[in-house]
């Protein structure tokens, strides 16, 4: 389940550190967080969709690694990001 292009562009615009920024950890984590939320809703309705469940767990792991990287490189950006996204940490 891919994100709608308009939603993805909106997220990129909100979290970009500069014009045209799509690769910063903040943008990547924000996009992954939205995809995780969407797939979580999908899984509530389709409990036995194991392919989606596996993809969801992979995304959660990828987001966790990116957050760990950001925490190790710049703790202030990390704290600002988890507060903006409402992630518990």
Curated annotation (Swiss-Prot):
Pfam families: Ribosomal_S15 (PF00312). The keyword Repeat does not apply. Disulfide bonds: none annotated. GO terms for molecular function: rRNA binding; structural constituent of ribosome. CDD domains: Ribosomal_S15p_S13e. One of the primary rRNA binding proteins, it binds directly to 16S rRNA where it helps nucleate assembly of the platform of the 30S subunit by binding and bridging several RNA helices of the 16S rRNA. Belongs to the universal ribosomal protein uS15 family. This is Small ribosomal subunit protein uS15. The gene is rpsO.
């Amino acid at each position: 389940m891919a994100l709608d292009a308009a939603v993805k562009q909106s997220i990129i615009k909100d979290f970009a550190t500069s014009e045209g920024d799509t690769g910063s950890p903040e943008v990547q984590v924000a996009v992954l967080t939205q995809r995780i939320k969407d797939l979580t809703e999908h899984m509530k309705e389709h409990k036995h969709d194991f392919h989606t469940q596996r993809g969801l767990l992979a995304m959660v792991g990828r987001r966790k690694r990116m957050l760990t990287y950001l925490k190790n490189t710049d703790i202030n950006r990390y704290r600002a990001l988890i507060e903006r996204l409402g992630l518990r940490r």
